[in-house]
Amino acid sequence: MVLPLLMAGTGALQLVAKWAIDRPRPNLAAWGFPSGHVLSLVVFFGLMTYLLASSTLARPRRWLGYAGCAATVLAVAFSRLYLEAHWVTDVAGGFTLGLAYLLLAICLVETLARRRAAASPQGSEAQVHLADDEGRGADVDSVVVAV
């Protein structure tokens, strides 16, 4: 449910920014700042990277996923410049605005998940016993977060 809401917000954010800034593209009459392609891809692949980081995949596979996400965003950003569809600042603005929006959304989702977990019976405090091989150890209070 997060992805559709996030991408719909990305489209709205890009339209508002283009309307507010009203800067034309290099060779076109349409608005150019920020680059909608870059903004959308930063949000989408940034979310994929965030989800990948919390996955149970082996580290080499996660790094392959990170590299694929980064390469896609960079390739599209370069293509926007190469095709003279945007100025460098349009692409940088799309990247910056997309990253800010993504970080805000991740913070919001994590905050809501923590609140929901704290309100549920499974989110109560639990005691964890940490012990070494010989049975020596200590009790540690921790909060169990169920997402």
Which residues does each predicted region cover?
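Hydrophobic alpha-helical bundle signature of multipass membrane enzymes
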Residues: 1-28, 48, 53-54, 67
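Membrane-embedded catalytic cores of phosphoryl/pyrophosphoryl-handling enzymes
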Residues: 26-34, 38-135
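Gram-negative host-targeted secretion-system effectors, predominantly Type III and Type IV
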Residues: 143-147
